[in-house]
Amino acid sequence: MSETMTTRPSRLTTAFDIPRAPGLTWYVQAQQPVGYEVSLTRGLLSPANPALAKAVGADGRSGTRALVVVDRVVDELYGTALRDYFTAWQADVTWLVMPGDEETKALEQVVEVTRAMTEMGILRRTERVVVVGGGVLMDVVGMAASLYRRGAPYVRVPTTLVGQVDAGVGVKTGVNHGTHKNRLGTYFAPEVTLIDPEFLRTVPARHIANGLAEIIKMALIKDADLFRLLEQTVADISSDTLADCGADMREVVSRAIAGMLDELEPNLWESVLERSVDYGHTFSPSLELRADPPLLHGEAVAVDMAVCVALAAGRQYLSESEAHRALALIAAAGLPLTHPVFTAELLQVGLADAVKHRDGLQRLPLTDGIGSCVFVNDVTAAELARALEYVRAYTDRTDGPGQ
């Protein structure tokens, strides 16, 4: 008796007989909804205020764990209050105190945060990292959170003015690399940013001015009413008046935050590269990393804005009166208008790097009347040189602040 055996090719072999099959293409399309909260509150470190406890999931019963990363200077000022707060809410906190200055904004700091997360054994979805500090530390911790197991929840508590109106309200994270500012980074939203003006009471005047640069930016490109309010109140703006959060100061800060969020929300991942919030951020990265002694971020932005005001005046986007008002406000905020290393050559270097970042076009935002902006792609080296001379001539006439 003989048996006949028939062997049939498997379905898998047939379907994926690659040499004989035509080309195969799969297309995947997905969406990831993102939502986060920016909340202005008072007395954040008072145990009677549940905002921070709620942000980390603490309910007054023991067991809630969190990693709290604190700026070294902030820890000296508020470390006891922070620890007392979490003790009152019976949270089990692991503490990491780190420097928060621009010179240490590097990948090594990101690794240090992820190492602390690993040693703590933080859970990927239900235990949070809290960063308490300025813009530099928020960028570092945000980047660490975005990379750790490809994303761990985190909470921001900005303690500087620039952190409260700018760095703390968007989704960018990043560190400096080589001679380039924020060359490495990610987009990663916090669950919540908690803003308490009380932290500003201990911020030095220079750092208040640092944050004012970002507020002036929003006024120039988006909010003429904010610009007029700043003209009226800039002489009164201080760490104490901001911390007291009277009606005018509250409006200044809240308008700046609302304006920033209004610009960011429809373009959170920068799919559109014409961004009005890039105003003051075309030439400033090159200046910020080359100045010696170092400039604060807002100081470099101020010098950049002054040149952009001059460029706009040269193109008659701004009247002479408007240009002078803009420069006068920047100077009145205690910010520089010029800097010795800010040469025509450096302007060209900065613009060339911005063109690479903006995918081959300048996409340079310029004010088109106070409170409005346009984008240009044809600024020349000669224009840059004239703009620099315009600002220098203005400072010579007015004895405005150079550097």
Where are these regions (language model features)?
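Short glycine/serine/threonine-rich phosphate/pyrophosphate-binding segments
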Residues: 136-143, 164-165, 286
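ATP/NTP phosphate-donor binding region
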Residues: 3-127
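Solvent-exposed alpha-helices and their adjacent loops that cap or buttress functional pockets
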Residues: 30, 60-61, 121-124, 147-149, ...
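A glycine/threonine-rich phosphate-anchoring loop and its flanking beta-alpha core
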Residues: 143-236
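Non-catalytic interfacial helical region
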Residues: 114-132, 141-156
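Active-site segments that bind and position negatively charged phosphate/pyrophosphate groups
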Residues: 229-345
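C-terminal charged capping/lid subdomain of soluble metabolic enzymes
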Residues: 3, 7-17, 22-25, 31, ...
